[in-house]
Amino acid sequence: MEIAALSPDVPPLAACALQQHPLYGAVLSALGGTARRLAMRRKGRDIGQVQIVRRRFGPLCIDWLPRGPVWQADTGTGARIEALRHLPASQPGRALWLASPDSPQDAALFRPLGYRALMTPQYVAELDLSPTQSARLAAQHGKWRNRLRRAQASGLTVYARPFDPARDDDLLGQELAQRRTRRYAALPPAFTHAWAATAPQATRLYLARNKSQTVAFMLMLLHPPAATYHIGWSGAQGRALSAHHLILWHAASDLAGRGFARLDLGHVDTHGSPGLARFKIGAGAHIRPLGPAMIRLRP
């Protein structure tokens, strides 16, 4: 088994999670972090890719494998386990290894190697952009679709463009205030600025306006061939007019037209955030489990 550094210019093998895309690693590096992207090869053939994030807490070094690896579709179970077995020894120094597998099936690959679950799996919402617009509309739940139609008839206009840090910093401030009020966590504004600085065209900002007033927005991060919902905000008027229903519909159609295969809408928590969960499910997103957060207890 050969494990070697992989150039950021090499595209991912599939529509991977944001955390396994080379842009994510580049942004972490810009923020002073360490991310290493690796190719896994067996008998001269690429079988997978993986991005590892290294973090230090005083003397403790942690290597974290988020939402990966990304495998060639025809790579067998034995080869996958073999690659994961060789991964820690291929990296410099000693570290505590953590993993957040992308699926329960991937989690099963880690267990024979001494990994044990720390937390129960989370669920994520993924919107498939490959069906036709009419098919995506039909996949929406009835109440969601009715709110979309009311928003379409409200006079709201949706505009789309790349995120501009100088022009749009006030939007980040509005979303940050919303976070504090609703007590939810998200990546800091510094991450948004670093992403926009690293890849200015890899953002897509959708603004809903009533006449000249912005009443809601959503910001997507682009990591072809997938995109990820990053942050959003809605004021009282935007909520009354179901502006986020209209924005998400426009965003899905826009991204599909640009060749994106999937829009990741983030975690689904039916207990902690039931309203947001209903919004994602009602939009027609597919809900699936990730693997649990895992720690390597033995080499």
Report the location of each language-model feature.
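A conserved beta-strand-loop-helix scaffold within acyl/acetyltransferase catalytic domains
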Residues: E2-K43, I47-P59, P104-Q105, L109-T120, ...
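A structural signal for short, well-ordered beta-strand segments and their strand-loop junctions
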Residues: A95-S100, Y159-A160, L207, R262-D264
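A short, internal acetyl-CoA/4′-phosphopantetheine-binding micro-motif in the GNAT/acyltransferase core
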Residues: P66-G76, S130-P131, I231-L241, D269
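Glycine-/proline-rich flexible loop or hinge segments
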Residues: L60-A73, P92-L96
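Aromatic (often tryptophan-rich) hydrophobic motifs at membrane interfaces
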Residues: I81-A89, T192-W195, P200-P299
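Short, conserved beta-strand segments within well-ordered enzyme catalytic domains
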Residues: A39, Q51, D63-P66, L98
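Active-site/acyl-donor-binding loops of N-acyltransferases
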Residues: M1-S7, R54-F57, F110-A135, G257-P299
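Non-catalytic accessory segments adjacent to catalytic cores
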Residues: G78-P121
